[in-house]
């Protein structure tokens, strides 16, 4: 079983944990519908950058 040879300091522990924080996804507003969506993703209505790119049908 692996056991550390020397104790890691609080500073080194903090440096390692500095990349663990969660970030929220950036939202944009579609100019056509005014709907919020993730950046660089198609909206639920099928619009991307103000143009209709996907035909959305009802799910059955």
Swiss-Prot record:
Keyword set includes Ribosomal protein: yes
Xref: SUPFAM superfamilies: Zn-binding ribosomal proteins
One Pfam family matching this protein: Ribosomal_L32p
UniProt keyword ATP-binding present: no
Gene Ontology MF terms: structural constituent of ribosome
InterPro entries xref list: Ribosomal_bL32, Ribosomal_bL32_bact, Ribosomal_zn-bd
GO cellular component: large ribosomal subunit
GO biological process, one term: translation
Region (Disordered): 1-47
Alphabetically ordered keywords of this record: Ribonucleoprotein, Ribosomal protein
Biased composition (Basic residues): 7-16
Family statement: Belongs to the bacterial ribosomal protein bL32 family.
Protein name: Large ribosomal subunit protein bL32
Native source species: Teredinibacter turnerae (strain ATCC 39867 / T7901)
């Amino acid at each position: 079983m692996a056991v550390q040879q020397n104790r890691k300091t609080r500073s080194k522990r903090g440096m390692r944990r500095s990349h663990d924080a969660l970030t929220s996804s950036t939202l944009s507003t579609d100019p056509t519908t005014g709907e919020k969506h993730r950046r660089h993703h198609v909206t639920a209505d099928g619009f991307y950058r103000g143009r209709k790119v996907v035909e959305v049908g009802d799910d059955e």
